[in-house]
Amino acid sequence: MRTLLVFLLLAILVAVLIGNIQVEACKDLTECSPYKLCIKGICERMIG
């Protein structure tokens, strides 16, 4: 019973962390550094 409770708490913690990462995704070009572009919510380096 105790291991099940620990497993559920860990699963909830992981879900919250994943949710926070998705919320912090970039939405426009101004959120990334000068040499990066916002592509599909992720700051990617410019090529070239």
Swiss-Prot record:
The modification Isoleucine amide is found at residue 47. Expressed in salivary glands. Highly expressed in the head, body and tail with a 2-3-fold higher expression in the head. GO terms for cellular component: extracellular region. Disulfide bonds join 26-38, 32-43. It is found in: Secreted. The keyword GTP-binding does not apply. Residues 1-21 form the signal peptide. Residues 22-27 form a propeptide. It comes from the Eukaryota. Keywords: Amidation, Disulfide bond, Secreted, Signal. Its main location: secreted. Belongs to the annelide toxin family. Does not show effect on voltage-gated calcium channels, potassium channels, and tetrodotoxin-sensitive sodium channels. Does not show activity on Nav1.7/SCN9A, and shows very weak activity on cation channel TRPA1. Leech salivary gland peptide with unknown function. This is Peptide HSTX-VI. It comes from Haemadipsa sylvestris.
